[in-house]
Structure formats: structure tokens, C-alpha cells
Amino acid sequence: VIFGGPMSANDEQPYIRDEMKLIERLLKAETPYLGICLGAQLMARTLGARVAEHGEGFREVGYYELTPTAPGCPLFPRPMMAYQWHREGFDLPDGATLLAKGNVFPNQACRVGRNAYGIQFHPEVTEAMNRRWATRAAHMLSDPGAQSREAQLEGRRLYDDALREWLDSFLDHWLPPLDGAPAATSGAAALRQPAFS
């Protein structure tokens, strides 16, 4: 799992290049991969797709609707609101399958091969993380398209249960329990550790 961060997939720092080399090896080996936000953008760029800011300067900071595509319906059974915090999006890499789309940044979730996924949104973010981000990066809340701190916290109250349910279902699909093991030992349980609070 490669999470998000304030850097860009287009940055030329050595650690960004190293991360992309790692992603390339993981994809070639068909190792299960999940890229969240920056992690999805790095996967897309590794595969030759463009990562760029919105043409009109819009950001997605807050809750935005995702719409499933026909191939995405098993993982995205219905439209849903998802938490976002990004200024760049990714073009769909050649050979990737678009699973969910959005109105501002069209490519919101994709699959490459059998078990590599990139998602632009942040299902892992807790309320504590949301509050911290909205405080430390308050300057971004005035960017075009960004939602206020209050709107984000209200969105959390309205949409978070469904987003957590989606995350549990997705992780159990992506990393199913071992034979005979209860679902609590699955990938969903792995992201429920205190480190994510």
C-alpha cells in the first residue's frame, strides 16, 4: 500500500524515482498493490500516464461523489461520496480498467492487471486526521473547489459509515481471508490499526 502525501508524482527527487521503480517491480510480479491518492498517481505515471493539476485550477478537498463504471460495479455497487484531498489527478494508463469516475477529476479508481488498484480518494482518513489536515493545510481550503473545514466534518458525519463499509468490502475483495480464517484477519482489519487514528 502506498499512501498519499504533499509531494507530486511529477517531482524529481530520488525517493520519488525509487518509489516508481518499486511500483514497476511490484506490477511486473503481479504483487497485490493499492495506491491511494499519490500512490495511485505514482502507479499511473510509472505506467506512462500523465499526472497533472486540473486545467481550471480546481482542487478536490472534502467529499465528492464517485460514480461506478460498468466494470467497476462489483467493487462500487452504487454511487458514493468519498473523502478527497488533492490538487492533481491522473490519466488512465494504457490497459487499465476505470472502475469509478468523478465530476472534477474523472479518473477516481482503476485496476491494472488482476490485483493492482489505484484510488484517488482517501477511505483511510479518520476524523482526527481530517482535523489535522484541515488545520495544517488551512490555506488550501480557499482553493477553487475546496470545501470548508465545517463542510468536511459534516460530510464525515453524513458519509463516513458508508465509506468505511466500502473500504472493508474492498479490502476483503483485494486481500481475502486465508482459508478458514475469519474476516477480521483480512486486509480490512490491517487498516484498522491505531497507527491510522
Where are these regions (language model features)?
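Acyltransferase
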Residues: 126-197
